[in-house]
Amino acid sequence: MPDLPLYLVRLSPDLTTKARRTRRRFQKRLVKNLREALSGFGGQYYIRNKWDRIYVQAEHPGSAHRIAGVFGVASVSRVDARLPPDLEQIVAVGHDLYRERVGRHRTFAVRARRSGRHHFGSRDVCIQLGAALNPYGTVDLDAPDVTVSVEVREEEAFLFCGREAGVGGLPLGVEGKAVCLISGGFDSPVAAWLALRRGVSLDYVFCNLAGDAYERMVASVTKVLADEWSFGDHPRLHVVDFAAVVDDLRAKTESRYWQVVLKRLMYRAAEAVALEIGAEAILTGEAIGQVSSQTLGNLRAIDAVATLPVFRPLLGFDKSWIIERAEEVGTAALSARVREYCAITPERPVTHSSPERVTAQETDLDLSLLNQAVGERHVLDLRRLTAIDLVEPYLFIDKVPEGAVMLDCRSPEQYSAWHYPGAELRAPHEAALRMKELSKDSIYVLYCEHGVQTAHIAELMQRVGYEAYSFQGGVTRLRDWAARQAVRSEPGEVE
């Protein structure tokens, strides 16, 4: 075996307290997940699975941090020395390794653990190594500046100083599969992370109310969960186009019930996906009282439509706690850019409904639209999704959405010769520099001669939370589209 850095991996208490047969299965899954975490990290690695410890040799300098981020790991330490289980050698090597470190600080402690048959005990290690280091510092067993650790096994001993805390929990994949309703905001990714930490594999269901730019932002957030926290699994994002479903809802239900009915439709979509892929539960980011649809009465009305269990890990947490967790998970910065779209926000939403009243509201809904949307959904393999995949398909548009703000990024002369009715003239550099002047409540379609410059500007705008697109093919394609749609020029504009 190559002489690679050695890491001592401690198992989460959630794993070590299991019955022997269950623990063996869980530990086997943890090793599988560790292999996947390290295989994409670069460099060689080797894993040795023992009952009470997992030993990892890995070439990459960031391996300790990567190992600590695998669910089921309590902590990890890089081993400074590996030697025979001989007390004199342990003391001599420990003295040489740590005397300078102890000398640079004021206090130290020696901690020792031992298993197997030896002519000495853990206390002997602590006393003799402590005595050897005592000239360089002061012993403090309560709050030492430096902790020197020794683990003695049957055939070898390990010396290390310090440990990195792991995320704990259960190995991902040992507790079955669920689907998570994801919106891209702060809440649902944190709820997903908490479920992943308990060993639940997840696929994600996104009910899209607002087009490709919104999908791109949600996919970017969800990819963080896939790439950084789903080692050993291959989660997918199921994108369900809810445009026709929402139009039907608006036309056939009272506005004050829109939010609750929408949530029930989303639950139906999530359950349909869950049953199709063999998932056993639905997960959401709802918290009691955070918005009008999340009162107890409304949650009861929403829950009634699901036959699978619905889990809400964030039920009792406030927003500040959720945002702090999102920062730790790594989704906060992306979620902060996501505007959670909702085209059906009434002035006075119902705050306490019932299953009976909401069911009555749904009498005239065409649920075949929902079934069609679920059946026609597209699915993204999040682990295989690349940076290019998250940019190119979402930048271009080949039609002008109703109410969109048009930005013409050509020269004044070209603008005078022809421009889309109502379009604002913005030089390319101005469009990029002055984007903060624009409202994030509008949809923006940018066009230039060939659609290349505006693709870059649309990319910059999407990164900071705008729903912005470049018209595919530039001004020639836009003129053709306008002619087919019989878009009429306003007075003073050239056809």
Where are these regions (language model features)?
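RNA-binding accessory domains that recognize and position tRNA/RNA substrates
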Residues: M1-V179, P189-H234, A304, H352-S353, ...
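Flexible, polar/low-complexity N-terminal or interdomain linker segments that lie immediately upstream
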Residues: R113-S115, D364-A417, S489-E495
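Active-site adenylate/phosphate-handling loop in enzymes that bind or generate adenylated species
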Residues: Q128-L133, R163-E175, W229, V246, ...
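Short, ordered loop/turn segments at secondary-structure junctions
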Residues: C207-A210, F242-A243, E286-Q290, P313-G316, ...
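A conserved beta-strand->alpha-helix junction
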Residues: K223-A251, R339, I344
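A short alpha-helix-loop-beta-strand transition element characteristic
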Residues: G330-V338
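Rhodanese-like catalytic fold shared by cysteine-dependent sulfurtransferases
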Residues: P412, S416-I443, H450-E495
